[in-house]
Amino acid sequence: ERLRLCELAFPDADVTPMELRREGKSYTVDTLREISRGNPGAELYFLVGTDMLLYMEQWYEFRALFSLCTLAALPRADGDLAEIERYAAYLRKTYGARIEIIAKTPLPMDSTALRAALPRRGGADRLCDAVYSEIIRCRLYGAKPDLAWLRGKTDAYLKPTRIPHVRGCEETAARLALRWGEDPEDAAEAGILHDITKRLSDDEQLRLAEKYGIVLN
């Protein structure tokens, strides 16, 4: 699933599954060697964040890694740039490492926090639409859709005259859920989705029911 998400996130890049195919322990230096063998003469760049750069000396065969690529270091948080510059200077002097610093405004994000946000209907503002859509489609990481995002997606499947009705159902469902002690956001999601197939023909609806194993009388 992560391979598929990478392909969606970087449509213009060649995303390789070589590390998934590799048996046993897999190290970054092995991947760089394999890429280098397959692309003789190519200049390789390895994108790293502050947290990775500061612990490079603990990486497996880090000296060989330095010889195979240029490190492209990105700050992960405000205030990281000065620390990156100091440590990069040390690695250059001590090991002859090639390091380029990408002085961009950091986007505070970590994968653990992002995965934790997805079941709480967060994350849509941190991910490209293709990736977020796939996560919601497959319900990866227990994700629940951001309701504003879901409205934007479902409105395209509704006649304009149907949208006010759907909004009313969403609001009523949320109020009733609160009244009876249920999750109002889950109820709102059901309200948003309840008319999603209205524009489909009868044959299209039957095919959809068959696809999802819905038995019709």
Tell where the protein language model's regions lie, with residue ranges.
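Amphipathic alpha-helical interaction segments
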Residues: 130-133, 168-171, 191
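Extreme N-terminal tail/first-helix region
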Residues: 143-158
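A short glycine/serine-rich beta->alpha loop
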Residues: 20-21, 156-160
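Alpha-helical phosphate/pyrophosphate-handling elements in metalloenzyme active cores
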Residues: 159-187
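Short glycine-/small-residue-rich flexible loop motifs, especially phosphate/cofactor-binding loops
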Residues: 132, 174, 206
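Nucleotidyltransferase catalytic core that binds NTPs
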Residues: 1-146
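Divalent metal-dependent catalytic cores for phosphoryl transfer on phosphate-bearing substrates
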Residues: 152-156, 179-217
